[in-house]
Amino acid sequence: RPCFTLPGCAAVNGIASFVSAPAVGVFMTEQLYRGRDYTDREGLTVLTCFSVCSLGFFGVLVSLGGIEHLYAQVVITSFVLTFVIAAICARIPPLSGKRDHYIDGTEQTAQDRVPRKIDHRFRAAVQAGIARSKELDFKVFMATLWSAITFTQKIVAYVVSVAIVALLLAEHTPLFTWLGMPIIPVLKLLQIPNAAEIAPATLVGIAEIALPVIMISGKGIAEESIFFITVLSSVQIIFFTESANAMLESIIPVTVLDL
């Protein structure tokens, strides 16, 4: 809570995307929001700051860029940057301006924000897990499965359509080249090689996370620049082929303008 203004359960929730997928992280956040574990502000903070691509997809990105030998460096750099950016974004608009109200409309109190003191944390975690497992029955399993299926169905159509349109715009129109022109001086100031060639790729990630790396792969781009674009793509978090659509389809109050 001191770093990210979030409750302790966000620690597990924040890692969910790293080990699975952004949409899974969003789904888990939505379930915690339904259970009054998060307020509007806390739920939106977790959605927009921690729904990072999975460790497996990091492998896809470095493979597309031809920098497989830098996989560990890409993951560690992205991991650190994600938490640094999250600590900043949680304290600035629009996240800082969201209400600290739960799903039922009740306002979070100062007592709610006080962390519980737990002795022997590992033992307590094991006992809580055992107790929780005893509550599981077939009806709960089917209800959760149905929620996951309907949630997936909502975003699949967007994933396919947005990815196709974004790829067509990136590969067959000069749109992103024009949009990337103001970025060239910034990249040159940072002394990043091939500034003009990679500038369009810095913006196209909002449509599809892998598209920036696809755009620059096989074009003789310096390894440093490929590393930069790969990390930038992963920490950008919000992309409309998956994470952004999952966020908009969740019950947590969020708008396109917020994203």
Where are the regions that the model predicts?
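Transmembrane helix-loop junctions in multipass membrane proteins, especially transporters and channels
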Residues: Y33, A90, P94-Y102, E171, ...
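Alpha-helical transmembrane segments of polytopic integral membrane proteins
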Residues: G25-V26, I85, V162, A166, ...
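Hydrophobic core segments of alpha-helical transmembrane domains in multi-pass membrane transport
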Residues: S54, T77-R91, I155-L168
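Intrinsically disordered, low-complexity non-transmembrane regions of multi-pass membrane transporters
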Residues: L95-I149
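Short helix-coil transition sites and intra-membrane helix breaks within transmembrane domains
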Residues: G14-V24, H172-F176, P200-L211, S234-F240
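Hydrophobic transmembrane alpha-helices that form the pore/transport pathway of multi-pass ion
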Residues: P2-S51, S217-E224
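C-terminal transmembrane helix pair
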Residues: Y38-Y71, V75-A87, I209-L259
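Transmembrane helical segments that form the transport core of multi-pass membrane transport proteins
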Residues: G129-G220
